[in-house]
Amino acid sequence: MIYFNSDYLEGAHPSVMARLNETNMVQTVGYGEDEYCAAAREKIRAVCQAPEADVHFLVGGTQTNTTVIASILRPWQGVLSADSGHINCHEAGAIESTGHKVITLPAAEGKITAQQVQDYVEWHRNDESTEHIVQPSMVYISHPTEGGTLYSKAELTALYDTCRKYGLPLFIDGARLGYGVMADGSELTIPEIARLCDVFYIGGTKVGALFGEAVVIMNPALKKDFRFIMKQRGGRMAKGRLLGIQFDALFTDDLYFKISRHADEMAYQIRDIFVSAGYPLLFDSPTNQQSPIMPDDELAELGKSFGYEYWERVDKTHSGVRFCASWATTQEHVDALRAAVQALRK
């Protein structure tokens, strides 16, 4: 069985594992105050071209989203998100568990626009019952989106300008950030992303680490006391050095970018396999996620040998599914998928 369900199905990149093993018996202080975390922070600041940034390491995406959002919002406030956004669809009410509403906007290709944010905020502020309605007080997006699509530089700039106009912090979920910035046609680099938001994170769990996300706080107003809420939300690991070591390895010799590009290149082959066989796609994704629409009977047959993620029902006999490439995807796996898809069409 070969699994393309997601990009976190293996352990960690061998370079990360080697560094963890090399440092295993070195004693350090706890809770991310060690020299490995310090080195990783400096490397991330350099990559972001943001020496003023605060960098914090957390374990996983849901924990990171919950901690960041809870640190920004007051009790009566909510976060604007695409209706397809991860915090709305795939986090089991984690944001709501902090007492904050996820306010959804209809997405197009997984994205929301500056105009949508402006329209909603204006409606809220001008409604006669405004004080009875959850106050939209920050904006959440992911890059790439849930379907693997990307914001253009113009789209993100407009969104950030609107957020600043209304005083709404913009938070970018970067769980798959590497796969986004290394994609064909990507208009945004990590330094540009850092300049066009208030806080974002660089995903490790899905991009070569065993676990871990690196939160980068750009807005000075959001920096104060963040480590307190990290602790309260279970985000400060006693063995925090394990996070620093991994990110230090990932940002040595451009490893993070090299393995992200590898995943995208594997994904382009996967896309071509399905397109050349006549299958349409749910999304025009330039990243590591590809989503063909297939007849259910063919999906069942393919599922005997390959894992994929069910996405949505398209009609009575067709479904959209997701095939993910990752830093660990091999050419042999892709070739096996190609042969199986071609066999379906014979």
Language-model features: locations:
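Hydrophobic beta-strand scaffold residues
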Residues: V79, V102-I103, L170-I172, L281, ...
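Conserved N-terminal alpha-helix of the aminotransferase class I/II PLP-enzyme fold
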Residues: H13-G61, D83-N88, A94
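PLP-dependent aminotransferase-class I/II
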Residues: G99-S137, I141-P144, L150-A158
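Active-site C-terminal subdomain of aminotransferase-like
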Residues: A108-E109, Q135-P136, S142, L150, ...
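Catalytic PLP-binding core of fold-type I/II PLP enzymes
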Residues: Y151-A183
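Conserved C-terminal alpha-helix-loop-beta "cap" of PLP-dependent enzymes
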Residues: R74-W76, Y268-A343
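Conserved PLP-anchoring active-site segment centered on the Schiff-base-forming lysine
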Residues: S71-C89
